[in-house]
């Protein structure tokens, strides 16, 4: 191992303070379920009292969904070398349908473990994996179909509600616009039974591998909060284990609900182990990437046996969902020939090349039922990959894209026959007028299995700003029914993202997802908006910053022009100044009404006009006066 690698592993002993410090005026709160080991984290944002001039009332705290795990809990000591605390082992043990294996069973996993040169690089506390007992199915879908509400399902119901009843009682939801959900069935409150029903129906998934016990359970489905995914991963051009773990902790701080490890460089197995042991959110992968590395990058040399071993290797580590491009069929490949941008999916191009080289059907398709057997033994969810997604708006909604989508619908039904959880990946590049057709087609072909899209990007003219071009499409398709949005950073099409790019991409997609939740009418979605709007009107600047998705940036922008502490209580900002602030003027109108005993603000405004008119006449009706 090089000196650089050793230094990187040593750095893993420490955590970037930026990723671990609590948010301003916030604290981690745990909501307890029906048993003491169901402890659901939410972030409580404390608010200042309304100033006396505005009524002087107390403002209740606002609770927001928290993906940051133990990292922002000052009561938890984080040691990346040991991994995060165990959340789920007891629940899994109680079900009595799994067994601890004597060791790793994949050939590649065993070979890596036996390689002494990797000792200083690997995660030191690798747990012995578990697997379903012979003949057992350990998927959350299997339990749901049997009518069982698991602790994971109860945990999720509490998490999705975020103290909704208390918020209603406190008046935080006195104003919420009705949504338009395009046929989604969103209840006024999420219950454990509703979670079970949605998972049993296949409309939602709980990605939760039995070997990822550090996981804080979450759900992906159109009748729940819209989720976002962030991507990390090394490449042949660089990055280290330390950098990838840092990207993970940074991404979940800002709101990534799941993270995909798309590593294609060195030490993929070891990097993934460090990520999983330190991740409170589901981790997804594209197993064909690692399988390709095992054959030195030659797609034609891939075999079912190599891929199968890769699935088992990653399932035993704890990967929660696999992107598998089983819908790239030989007959669809010629349909991409006249495209502007051809096949842009890495996984799709790998499988297309294999199909053409052997002139055989995609082995992921022909071995799909065998893949299902592996998935249900570890409760790994399918993310059925869209290997033929459009890479330009010119190619959107073509025969290749929709042909593959129809095949993904067929595969969904096969997976459901095995009680394996499924979500469907979607585009890509789609102009705004074609986005709803994508969503409607997916709901029809895939029987409402959750949709998971990359954007889509709505135009191709903005390299460097594709987080915006895609954020527009993401908000739209999230409203139409997409369950999870894969973030796009400003570096899309240009290079590997750094920490700042990751944050920008996640914040952009949190905005898109939240806008979709508002539009769908998700219960409680407007609580944060109402609280921030009230703080804005009352010039509670610190509360405005702290209620935002990115308090640091909001505070920094304000302080660029008004850096003094006194500006944090001023009744204006640098945009309009003290004399032209619309909210200050509105408050003055209200004060005038109160002083003059007028109950209607419009009457107060009219009275003010009359007063000024009388003054104009008294002063001689002169338009211009010498001053």
From Swiss-Prot:
Q: Where is this region: Disordered?
A: 1-29
Give cofactor(s), names only. Answer: [4Fe-4S] cluster
- Extract the Pfam families matched here: ThiC-associated, ThiC_Rad_SAM
Reaction(s) the record says it catalyses? 5-amino-1-(5-phospho-beta-D-ribosyl)imidazole + S-adenosyl-L-methionine = 4-amino-2-methyl-5-(phosphooxymethyl)pyrimidine + CO + 5'-deoxyadenosine + formate + L-methionine + 3 H(+)
**Keywords (A to Z) from UniProt:** 4Fe-4S, Iron, Iron-sulfur, Lyase, Metal-binding, S-adenosyl-L-methionine, Thiamine biosynthesis, Zinc
Q: Where does substrate bind?
A: 231, 260, 289, 325, 345-347, 386-389, 425, 452
Cellular component per GO, a single term = cytosol
Q: What is its EC number?
A: 4.1.99.17
Q: How does it assemble?
A: Homodimer.
* UniProt family annotation: Belongs to the ThiC family.
Q: What is this protein called?
A: Phosphomethylpyrimidine synthase
> What's the source species for this entry?
Pseudomonas paraeruginosa (strain DSM 24068 / PA7)
């Amino acid at each position: 191992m090089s000196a650089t690698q050793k230094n990187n592993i040593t750095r893993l002993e420490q955590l970037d303070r930026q990723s671990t410090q609590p948010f301003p005026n916030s604290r981690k709160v745990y909501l307890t379920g029906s048993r003491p080991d169901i402890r659901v984290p939410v972030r409580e944002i404390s608010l200042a009292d309304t100033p006396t001039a505005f009524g002087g009332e107390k403002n209740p705290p606002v609770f927001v969904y928290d993906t940051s795990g133990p990292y922002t809990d000052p009561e938890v000591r984080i040691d990346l070398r040991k991994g995060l605390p165990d959340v789920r082992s007891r629940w899994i043990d109680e079900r009595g349908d799994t067994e601890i294996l004597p060791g790793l069973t994949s050939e590649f996993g065993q070979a890596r473990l036996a390689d002494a040169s990797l000792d200083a690089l690997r995660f030191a506390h690798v747990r012995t994996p578990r697997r379903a007992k012979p003949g057992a199915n350990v998927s959350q879908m299997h339990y749901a179909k049997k009518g069982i509400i698991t602790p994971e399902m109860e945990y999720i119901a509490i998490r999705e509600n975020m103290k909704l009843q208390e918020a209603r009682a406190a008046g935080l939801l006195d104003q919420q616009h009705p949504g338009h959900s395009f046929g989604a069935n969103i209840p006024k409150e999420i219950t454990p039974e509703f979670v079970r029903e949605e998972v049993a129906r296949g409309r939602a998934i709980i990605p939760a591998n039995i070997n990822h016990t550090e996981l804080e359970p979450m759900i992906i489905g159109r009748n729940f909060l819209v989720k976002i995914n962030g991507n990390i991963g090394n490449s042949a051009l660089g990055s280290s284990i330390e950098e990838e773990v840092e990207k993970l902790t940074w991404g979940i701080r800002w709101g990534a609900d799941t993270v995909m490890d798309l590593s294609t460089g060195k030490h993929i197995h070891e990097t993934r182990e460090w990520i999983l042991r330190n991740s409170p959110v589901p981790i997804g992968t594209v197993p064909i990437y690692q399988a390709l590395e095992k054959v030195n990058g030659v797609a034609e040399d891939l075999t079912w046996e190599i891929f199968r071993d890769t699935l088992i290797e990653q399932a035993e580590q704890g990967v929660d969902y696999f992107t598998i491009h089983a819908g790239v069929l030989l007959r669809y490949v010629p349909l991409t020939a006249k495209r502007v941008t051809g096949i842009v999916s890495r996984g799709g191009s790998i499988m297309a090349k294999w199909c053409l080289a052997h002139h055989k059907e995609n082995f992921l398709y022909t071995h799909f039922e065998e893949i299902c057997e592996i998935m249900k033994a570890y409760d790994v969810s399918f993310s059925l990959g869209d290997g033929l997604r459009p890479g330009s708006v010119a190619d959107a909604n073509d025969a290749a894209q929709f042909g593959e989508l129809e095949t993904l619908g067929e595969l969904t039904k096969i997976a459901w026959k095995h009680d394996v959880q499924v979500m469907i990946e979607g585009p890509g590049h789609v102009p705004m007028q074609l986005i709803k057709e994508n969503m409607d087609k997916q709901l029809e072909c895939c029987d409402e299995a959750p949709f998971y899209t990359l954007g889509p990007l709505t135009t191709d003219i903005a390299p460097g700003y594709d987080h915006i071009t895609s954020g527009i499409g993401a908000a739209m398709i999230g409203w139409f029914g997409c369950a999870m949005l894969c973030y796009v950073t400003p570096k899309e099409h240009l290079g590997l993202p750094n920490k700042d790019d990751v944050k920008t991409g996640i914040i952009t997609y949190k905005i898109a997802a939240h806008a979709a939740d508002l539009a769908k009418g998700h219960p409680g979605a407007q609580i944060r908006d109402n609280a921030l709007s009230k703080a804005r009107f009352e010039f509670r600047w610190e509360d405005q910053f702290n209620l935002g998705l990115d308090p640091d940036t909001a505070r920094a922008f304000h302080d660029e022009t008004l850096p003094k502490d006194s500006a944090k209580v001023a009744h204006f900002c640098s945009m309009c100044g003290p004399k032209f602030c619309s909210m200050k003027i509105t408050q003055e109108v209200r004060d005038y009404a109160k002083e003059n005993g007028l109950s209607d603000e419009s009457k107060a405004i009219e009275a003010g006009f009359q007063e000024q008119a009388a003054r104009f006449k008294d002063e001689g009706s002169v338009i211009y006066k010498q001053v």
